[in-house]
């Protein structure tokens, strides 16, 4: 038979009858692919050709297959509802409601005053409040006293002296109440004090602050303040200071700002305005906050029945007070006074500062007078920083200049 007549093999059948690749060959091919063998069969990864641990790897694979199968069998054989990870039940967390008020007592070397104010707080008729004492690195027994006798008080101890204003802000930062109340450590509030503050606070939702009636500790018929007022000359005034209390201010509840020695602040306003300006350090920081709150459209209310007795020297002349009042008055005006009112009251403002400076110069030998002049000089030297703050404060005003001007007093 010729070659042409010979039957040709069927390609499909020959492929079917071709011997298949062995399992070992398939494994070798897979290893070569994973190892990246080149076209000549040279392996670029010598570890793949190392059979030192091949038996161990194979044994591990067998063990894992058996373990998986065993787990599956056990799971299928488990009773209905079986859970290999039992659910652990825990008692519900106890929710601690935030108090309505947080009373913050800044303290510096006031161990001799603290028992009076803290015992008075324990005697308050209104009880939904917490007490926070911020100790400003006292060198007396204040911290030891608080830890031993007043464990219910939240104590924050500054590692170094940071100033009164910083302590107020620190306490307010951890306060949980809707009403943030600042109370000096050298005071004694009456048992109804906090209840009266709360009553007025709730009745005046537009009040950023509610301030107390402060009377002298040792002359309890004599006023320290019934609220802060601001003169047309930009100088703050304690309304009623040194006057005998006959209730003459009880009906005049609208004030410019509250005295930080015993005033309640609305939490959201405090946070929105950033609290006290820590650059003030001490003195007039409360008037500065009140000025900013007024510019933002909020009110300040006097609560005449919220009575607090305050240790205050009638003689004055404190060097720190003289310095910081002299400096901070200038900063207060520079930060907050609208431009139109600066122009309108320019003569009164300049005249007021000159009169204070001249009076201090005439008494130059007095330490308090020197401190006042140094404070005024420091106020002028620090104007640049206050003018930067002014550029943030003034565009946010929510009150007309004419309405603000009506709040200023002539004397």
Please report, for each region that a protein language model flagged, where it lies by residue:
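N-proximal low-complexity "stem/linker" segments adjacent to membrane-targeting elements
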Residues: 3-7, 53, 60-123
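Cell-envelope/extracellular polymer assembly enzymes that use nucleotide-activated donors
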Residues: 99-102, 130, 288
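A conserved acidic beta->alpha catalytic loop
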Residues: 120, 127, 135-144, 160
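Glycine-rich, basic loop-to-helix element that forms the pyrophosphate-binding segment
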Residues: 157-175, 185, 196
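Short aromatic/hydrophobic "clamp" motif used to bind/position activated sugar donors
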Residues: 180
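Conserved donor NDP-sugar-binding/catalytic core segment of glycosyltransferases
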Residues: 188-235
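A short, conserved alpha-helix in the catalytic core of glycosyltransferases
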Residues: 254-307
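Active-site-adjacent helix/loop segment of glycosyltransferases
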Residues: 300-388, 402
């Amino acid at each position: 038979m010729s070659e042409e007549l010979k039957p040709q093999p069927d390609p499909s059948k020959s492929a079917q009858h071709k011997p298949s690749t062995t399992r070992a060959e398939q494994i070798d091919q897979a290893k070569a692919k994973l190892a990246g063998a080149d076209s000549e069969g040279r392996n670029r990864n010598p570890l793949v050709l190392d059979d030192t641990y091949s038996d161990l790897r194979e044994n591990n694979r067998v063990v894992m297959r058996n373990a998986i199968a065993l787990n599956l069998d056990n799971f299928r054989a488990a009773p209905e509802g079986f859970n290999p990870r039992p659910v652990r039940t825990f008692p519900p967390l106890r929710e601690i409601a935030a108090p309505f008020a947080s009373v913050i007592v800044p303290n510096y070397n006031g161990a001799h005053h603290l028992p009076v104010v803290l015992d008075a707080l324990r005697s308050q008729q209104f009880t939904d409040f917490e007490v926070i004492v911020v100790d400003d690195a006292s060198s007396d027994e204040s911290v030891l006293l608080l830890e031993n006798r007043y464990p219910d008080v939240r104590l924050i101890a500054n590692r170094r002296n940071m100033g009164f204003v910083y302590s107020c802000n620190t306490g307010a930062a951890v306060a949980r109440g809707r009403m943030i109340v600042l109370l000096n450590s050298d005071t004694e509030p009456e048992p109804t004090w906090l209840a009266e503050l709360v009553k007025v606070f709730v009745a005046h939702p537009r009040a950023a602050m509610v301030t107390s009636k402060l009377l002298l500790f040792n002359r309890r018929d004599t006023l320290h303040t019934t609220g802060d007022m601001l003169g047309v000359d930009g100088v703050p005034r304690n309304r009623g200071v040194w006057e005998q209390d006959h209730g003459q201010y009880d009906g005049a509840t609208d004030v410019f700002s509250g005295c930080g020695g015993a005033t309640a602040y609305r939490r959201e306003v405090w946070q929105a305005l950033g609290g006290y300006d820590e650059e003030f350090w001490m003195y007039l920081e409360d008037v500065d906050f009140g000025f900013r709150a007024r510019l933002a459209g909020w009110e300040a209310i006097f609560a005449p029945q919220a009575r607090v007795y305050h240790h205050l020297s009638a003689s004055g002349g404190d060097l720190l007070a003289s310095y910081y009042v002299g400096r901070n008055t200038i900063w207060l005006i520079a930060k907050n006074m609208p431009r139109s009112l600066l122009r309108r009251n320019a003569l009164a403002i300049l005249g007021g500062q000159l009169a204070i400076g001249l009076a201090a110069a005439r008494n130059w030998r007095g330490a308090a007078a020197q401190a006042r002049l140094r404070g005024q000089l420091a106020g002028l030297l620090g104007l640049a920083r206050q003018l930067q703050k002014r550029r943030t404060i003034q565009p946010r005003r929510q009150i007309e200049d004419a309405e603000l001007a009506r709040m200023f007093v002539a004397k």
